């Protein structure tokens, strides 16, 4: 049985994410133990790492540092090459830095900055809330069986802008395009909430549980 460490660092709707991961595993008949944890030892030994996150970039980074799990995550992801996925602010934390409330260092696992959305249509509001279509930029195992143009659920005021376009997997549009998904080697992140995105979101989570980068 594979162990999936769902990181508890004081940010993110953990129960919704846990429930969705369990349902995704059930639908594919996958033997996965979804563990909500802030235990560095468990994280370091996990077979997969999943990082949620809601709120401000700086507070999420501070919460991650306070738990002491960053080094364990780094050991698992870069030391052993286990698959990693971040969602919403967990996805944004992959960046080099976030520009919300000043400059806050990110994990720098995907080079780039997290910048505020600036729609070119004055009728569009921030935060960007609700369903939006994604455009797949390139094929990726995480989006296997998910249609180009699939609708996902977003709740964001900021977005990760990667320094290298080859790290972008999908985009969405809110008065201008922004990055909806990134992937590099065994690291991936999505700006939307797969746990709120119904069948397409569950398909993505199931793909993550089967992903072998």
UniProtKB/Swiss-Prot annotation:
Residues 3-213 form the Glutamine amidotransferase type-1 domain. One of its GO terms (biological process) is L-histidine biosynthetic process. Gene3D superfamilies: 3.40.50.880. It catalyses: 5-[(5-phospho-1-deoxy-D-ribulos-1-ylimino)methylamino]-1-(5-phospho-beta-D-ribosyl)imidazole-4-carboxamide + L-glutamine = D-erythro-1-(imidazol-4-yl)glycerol 3-phosphate + 5-amino-1-(5-phospho-beta-D-ribosyl)imidazole-4-carboxamide + L-glutamate + H(+); L-glutamine + H2O = L-glutamate + NH4(+). Its main location: cytoplasm. The active site is at 88 (nucleophile), 193, 195. SUPFAM superfamilies: Class I glutamine amidotransferase-like. The keyword Transmembrane does not apply. Pfam families: GATase (PF00117). Pathway: Amino-acid biosynthesis; L-histidine biosynthesis; L-histidine from 5-phospho-alpha-D-ribose 1-diphosphate: step 5/9. Heterodimer of HisH and HisF. IGPS catalyzes the conversion of PRFAR and glutamine to IGP, AICAR and glutamate. The HisH subunit catalyzes the hydrolysis of glutamine to glutamate and ammonia as part of the synthesis of IGP and AICAR. The resulting ammonia molecule is channeled to the active site of HisF. PANTHER family: IMIDAZOLE GLYCEROL PHOSPHATE SYNTHASE SUBUNIT HISH. This is Imidazole glycerol phosphate synthase subunit HisH. It comes from Caulobacter vibrioides (strain ATCC 19089 / CIP 103742 / CB 15) (Caulobacter crescentus). The lineage of its organism: Bacteria, Pseudomonadati, Pseudomonadota, Alphaproteobacteria, Caulobacterales.
């Amino acid at each position: 049985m594979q162990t999936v460490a769902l990181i508890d660092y004081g940010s993110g709707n953990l129960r919704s994410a846990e429930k969705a991961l369990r349902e995704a595993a059930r639908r594919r008949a996958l033997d996965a133990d979804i563990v909500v944890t802030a235990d560095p030892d468990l994280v370091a030994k996990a077979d997969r790492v999943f990082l949620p996150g809601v709120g401000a970039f700086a507070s999420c980074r501070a919460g991650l540092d306070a738990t002491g799990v960053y080094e364990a995550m780094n050991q698992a992801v870069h030391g052993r090459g286990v698959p990693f996925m971040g969602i919403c602010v967990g996805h944004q934390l992959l960046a080099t830095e976030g520009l919300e409330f000043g400059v806050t260092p990110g994990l720098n696992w995907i080079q780039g900055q997290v910048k505020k959305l600036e729609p070119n249509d004055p009728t569009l509001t921030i935060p960007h809330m609700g369903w939006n279509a994604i455009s797949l930029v390139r094929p990726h195992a995480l989006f296997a069986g998910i249609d180009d143009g699939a609708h996902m659920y977003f709740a964001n005021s900021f977005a990760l802008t990667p320094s290298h376009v080859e790290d972008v997997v999908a985009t969405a549009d809110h008065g201008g395009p922004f990055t909806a998904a990134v992937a590099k080697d065994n690291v991936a992140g999505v700006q939307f909430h797969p746990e709120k995105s119904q069948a397409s979101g569950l398909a993505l989570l199931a793909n993550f549980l089967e992903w072998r980068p």
